[in-house]
């Protein structure tokens, strides 16, 4: 039981802390100076262990022959409007599913979450929705689309001018701080974390479902 709880905790931590690198992230060129800064648009991604869900029948079993429905979140796409004081980010994704028993038409509702995460760990907003998968009689596969959105204050997602200057200032050989990586300085790291927002989507899993994903 202790091992199982530890694995669940590890999975939850990974889901909360998982981040996604996208165009606009900080780029270090040859270890000297910073050549680009991150966008104010939230990065969009799927936290580890939350992109898959398995339903079992009977519900208490977790063996391969008891798998009823399996589903995966894929084809995540995002759009961002950063033209105003509020940054609007939206995402669409596809849920692809398979079922074991293809007899009869069937609808399956799967819950999913969309969270706005700040600094890699602080959840500032969360919404839970559902996607409905409609299997036709004799059909093993079905798919459905889901949506997510986030609104971020532009000022909160923007680095202060002094921090930007310290990060992007060219460093030349002979400078006292030429060998110092600005990203290692505590106040700069803290400012970067405060300005970092992510829009994360995944299945809203029970503890047992999360444990299964972590340990399989």
Show where each model-derived region lies.
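Post-signal peptide N-terminal segment of mature Sec-exported envelope proteins
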Residues: 29-56
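An exposed acidic His-Trp-rich patch
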Residues: 106-159
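Bacterial signal peptide processing site
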Residues: 21-24
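Bacterial N-terminal signal peptides that target proteins for export
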Residues: 1-9
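Intrinsically disordered, low-complexity, charge-dense segments enriched in Lys/Arg
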Residues: 10, 147-208
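C-terminal motif of bacterial Sec signal peptides marking the signal peptidase cleavage site
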Residues: 16-19
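Beta-strand elements of well-folded, non-transmembrane domains
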Residues: 75-82, 91-101, 112-120, 133-137, ...
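Short, solvent-exposed beta-strand/turn "edge" segments of beta-rich domains on protein surfaces
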Residues: 61-69, 77-89, 99-106, 120-122, ...
């Amino acid at each position: 039981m202790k091992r199982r709880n530890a694995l669940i905790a590890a999975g939850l931590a990974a889901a909360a802390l998982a981040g996604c690198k996208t165009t606009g992230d900080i780029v270090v060129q040859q270890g000297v100076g910073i050549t680009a800064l991150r966008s104010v648009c939230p990065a969009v991604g799927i936290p580890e262990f939350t992109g898959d869900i398995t339903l079992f029948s009977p519900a208490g079993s977790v063996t391969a022959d008891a798998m009823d429905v399996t589903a995966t979140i894929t084809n995540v796409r995002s759009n961002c409007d950063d033209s105003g004081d509020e940054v609007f980010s939206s995402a669409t994704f596809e849920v692809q599913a398979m079922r074991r028993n293809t007899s009869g038409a069937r609808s399956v509702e799967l819950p999913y979450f969309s969270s706005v995460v700040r600094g890699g760990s602080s959840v500032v907003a969360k919404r839970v929705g559902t996607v409905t998968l409609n299997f036709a009689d004799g059909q093993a596969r079905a798919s459905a689309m889901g949506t997510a959105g986030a609104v971020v204050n532009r000022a909160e997602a923007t680095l202060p001018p002094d921090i930007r200057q310290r990060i992007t200032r060219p460093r030349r050989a002979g400078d006292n701080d030429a060998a110092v990586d600005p990203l290692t300085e505590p106040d700069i790291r803290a400012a970067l974390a405060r300005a970092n927002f992510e829009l994360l989507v995944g299945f809203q899993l029970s503890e047992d479902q999360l444990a299964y994903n972590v340990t399989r």
